[in-house]
Amino acid sequence: MRVVEPQEGCALLLGRPLAERGLLLDCVWPVCNRWGAADVEQPWQGAGGRERNFLVDPREQLAAQRWGRDNQRSLLGVAHSHPAGEVRPSSADLRRSEPQRVMLILNGVGDVQSWWLGEDRRARPLPIHVL
């Protein structure tokens, strides 16, 4: 995701639930940031450029979900970068993200934090365990 700095980069997170142990994230699917692209519907106009916003291309998301179904994986959430910001979700991130998903944020100095977005659209820190 850092390759597109100073713009925000994004990726889809795929994996599967583990019985009583949380989620196994075993596929990071890089996608293009389509924020502001003329051929993609923009639900939030006037909110700035790709330096502070991202939008996953719906076609890329469908391709990832198809691959996931074929490989017993499901969409767990989205990763994106805050090149000049903190590793916590912005108010825009919280408004635009689907609830009951993982949100992983990487900043410009390499810090990473994962979050669980609940039904109430509040982000709660989610521990990461590397296997």
Describe the function of each predicted region.
Residues M1-L75, P83-L131:
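Conserved beta-strand-loop surface patch within small alpha/beta domains used
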